[in-house]
Amino acid sequence: MTTRLDDTFARCRAEGRAALVTYVMAGDPDPETSFAVLRALPAAGADIVEFGLPFTDPMADGPAIQAAGLRALKAGQSVARTLDLVRRFRAEDPRTPVILMGYYNPIYTYGVPRFLADAVAAGVDGLIVVDLPPEEDDELCLPARQAGLAFIRLATPTTDERRLPAVLANTSGFVYYVSITGITGAATPDFGAVASAVARIRAQTALPVVVGFGVKTGEHAAAIARNADGVVVGSALVDTLARSLDLEGRATSGSVAAVLALVRDLAAGVRSAAGGAA
């Protein structure tokens, strides 16, 4: 049986292009604004949605996503409320894949079996848990896959030929290649190095390879899309939302529109590279 992720990548391949994967933080700056952004992402051009689980100690994230998580937590966002937002989204949109991205602690605290059951029931398609290495697959990766969720791993510029097989072993859905060494939202990727890295990963897996970290504009997205199966954009969207907030950190009348305008630009960039994704 194919999954929403399988269908999405197949559809993008049929169109000769990469998928646009957009990341937003659940509950930022408040649940209703977050949901308004979430529900509008597909129409703006997002093929896959990553929804961040806010956490107090997001070690892999830069200042933009750290601040977004703190805003969400201040507004009362929790794992349960995040799953509620996914449930509401899924009631309106049966097609667009939703990936939850975050850290293990909130999931562990919620309870792994309960979390997996509730995530599946809400309509989640997969998980990215950045602080669980392959050596700890029994904790969440294998139970998640048994529950029917994709478990997406990160590969980085420092993932060498000895380490890559372990990273890929239980990965499903797609492989997420981190284009730079460091935290989210950092420098612009070296597009030539990204192309080489994607080719190296593709030599060892049939899974789609998507690339993220440092992608900020439609031009960046187009450059990545020529060599990858998908392009992830997160910090740029979170930054755009943050800049639209008032001095108290609350949403304004232009907040949702500002995020969607950038998504449309990114989607145009990805689609302008059609024919380049192989």
Curated annotation (Swiss-Prot):
Look up the record and report any one GO term of the cellular component aspect: cytosol
Q: Which organism was this protein described from?
A: Methylobacterium nodulans (strain LMG 21967 / CNCM I-2342 / ORS 2060)
Give the transmembrane region(s).
Answer: none
Which pathway or pathways does this protein act in?
A: Amino-acid biosynthesis; L-tryptophan biosynthesis; L-tryptophan from chorismate: step 5/5
CDD domains in the cross-refs: Tryptophan_synthase_alpha
Q: Which reaction does it catalyse?
A: (1S,2R)-1-C-(indol-3-yl)glycerol 3-phosphate + L-serine = D-glyceraldehyde 3-phosphate + L-tryptophan + H2O
UniProt keywords (A-Z) are: Amino-acid biosynthesis, Aromatic amino acid biosynthesis, Lyase, Tryptophan biosynthesis
UniProt name for this protein: Tryptophan synthase alpha chain
Which Gene3D superfamilies does the UniProt entry name for this protein?
Aldolase class I
The family line of this record is:
Belongs to the TrpA family.
